[in-house]
């Protein structure tokens, strides 16, 4: 939570309507790039409904931070993201930090685990979430801090919740995850409100910042891979240290 506050306490709501919108941010909305008009010049007036929708079909009032904007594009954000990369021996510059090839969500998790006191027998740091997912799935470590639990299930504070991304967004089973080859995203669960049907989880490089995701659960109060197509969750890394 302390690290999240250093980034400005950004919140992203992941709803059952397939939305994923920033609801709280220390920064104003990024200025939209002008859209081309029919004659090839930049349009200055209001665009059509199609222009006002992002790539996921969400309306213009859904705040998002594209690459090159948001907290990671500030000097402070760059310095903090560079700290996370240092945990795996890398030193990207501030331009690289804002590029997809240097996505820093996995090294954020690695940094947090080391700060929490986990050693190499419990959790191995990695540049890819799939590295430590496979470690936990295959029982690689002598004293593992986590084991894999398939969904649907109810997360608990201290667990990691993970989803596939890109070409592997819709994986159906944790056995399909390849070590260092499957693009993924994982968040750290910090609170579960069963009455409201919401899980709160903190992750890095979410809308170009360390953000708290407020994730709506299914009708049974569980996390699953179907309730929100923005992040079709695949598994829980269950915390065995609690």
Regions found by a protein language model. Give the residues of each.
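Low-complexity, Gly/Ser/Thr/Pro-rich intrinsically disordered linker/tail segments
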Residues: 205, 209-242
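Surface-exposed intrinsically disordered loops and tails
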Residues: 59-94, 134-146, 171-174, 178-179, ...
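Assembly/interface hotspot detector across virion components, adhesins/toxins, and nucleic-acid enzymes
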Residues: 11, 189-192, 215
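Secondary-structure boundary/capping motif
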Residues: 108, 191, 201, 235-240
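N-terminal capping segments
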Residues: 1-121
């Amino acid at each position: 939570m302390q690290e999240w506050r250093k980034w400005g306490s950004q919140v992203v709501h992941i709803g059952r309507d397939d939305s994923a919108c920033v609801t709280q941010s220390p920064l104003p909305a990024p200025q939209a790039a002008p859209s081309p008009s029919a004659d090839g010049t930049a349009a200055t007036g209001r665009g059509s409904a199609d222009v006002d929708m992002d790539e996921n079909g969400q309306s213009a009032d859904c705040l998002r931070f594209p690459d090159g904007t948001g907290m990671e594009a500030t000097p402070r954000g760059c310095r903090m993201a560079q700290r996370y990369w240092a945990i795996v021996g890398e030193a990207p510059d501030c331009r690289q930090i804002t590029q997809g090839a240097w996505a820093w969500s996995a090294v954020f998790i690695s940094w947090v685990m080391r700060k929490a006191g986990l050693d190499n027998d419990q959790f191995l740091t990695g540049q890819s979430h799939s590295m430590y997912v496979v470690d936990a799935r295959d029982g690689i470590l002598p004293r593992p801090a986590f084991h894999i639990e398939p969904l649907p299930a109810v997360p608990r504070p201290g667990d990691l919740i993970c989803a596939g991304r890109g070409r592997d967004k819709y994986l159906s089973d944790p056995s399909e995850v390849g070590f260092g080859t499957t693009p993924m995203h994982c968040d750290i669960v910090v609170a579960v409100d069963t009455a409201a049907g919401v899980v709160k989880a903190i992750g890095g490089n979410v809308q170009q910042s360390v953000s708290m995701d407020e994730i709506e659960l299914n009708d049974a109060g569980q996390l699953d891979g179907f309730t929100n197509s923005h992040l079709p969750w695949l598994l829980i890394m269950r915390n065995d240290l609690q």
